[in-house]
Design a protein with these regions (language model features):
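Active-site pocket-lining/capping segments in soluble small-molecule metabolic enzymes
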Residues: 1-200
Length: 200
């Protein structure tokens, strides 16, 4: 095991108590927007932090990125919901499934249902379900490889969630070609998130 991806303070606190601070990689959900926050986490002896998704390229150039990794591909969650889409439409069948929500523009938003108690921390036989609703387009910085590398990050991350094995392999190969060889051979429809415009 080379690292543990940590998404909240509670998880970090527990891992630190167990002596795993130096294996912790903070996800983008933990605050590292400025150098003061980065230095705080360095003092905790974490392995790395993740570049905030809300900062744009210009803002990232002014951030200390040497101990950071950046997400260059992934389906980003739009919402975590305790209101199960399946339960509220056709009824819960306790099957972990994928659904699709369509908006008025016919954009499809993948929904993943999580139904098993061990995943929700509930030990009752019928625990609460929850859903993750993902953006209609994956986040991707394929053509921005040179700009990403110029930020001086220590690693790039591809975050696979709902992709098939074949899609995962193809995307991985294309990103390796772009980031190692500077070659983009395939067109994808990606959102760039805040990389170009930033959060307001």
């Amino acid at each position: 095991m080379t690292g543990l991806l940590v998404r909240n303070l509670e998880s970090y606190s527990r891992l630190a108590e167990l002596g795993f601070s130096e294996k912790c990689v903070l996800d983008h959900s933990l605050y590292t927007w400025n150098d003061e926050a980065i230095h705080f986490w360095k003092n905790q002896k974490i392995l790395r932090n993740t570049v905030p998704l809300e900062l744009n390229e210009k803002e990232l150039r002014h951030r200390e990125n040497a101990g950071s990794e950046v997400i260059v591909y992934g389906r980003l969650p739009l919402m975590h919901s305790a209101q199960c889409v399946r339960k509220n439409t056709t009824g819960c069948n306790r099957q972990e499934d994928r659904l699709v929500l369509k908006d008025r523009y016919d954009k499809e938003f993948p929904v993943v249902c999580y139904c098993h108690p061990w995943k929700t921390g509930n030990t009752k036989p019928e625990g609460p379900c929850y859903n993750i609703i993902y953006n209609s387009l994956p986040y991707g910085l394929l053509k921005e490889a040179d700009k990403v590398k110029a930020l001086g990050v220590s690693a790039v991350r591809l975050s696979f969630t709902i992709e098939s094995a074949g899609q995962t392999q193809q995307i991985l190969e294309d990103f390796v070609a772009a980031y190692r060889e500077g070659r983009v051979s395939r067109e994808y429809e990606f959102t760039k998130g805040h990389f170009k415009r930033g959060a307001e």
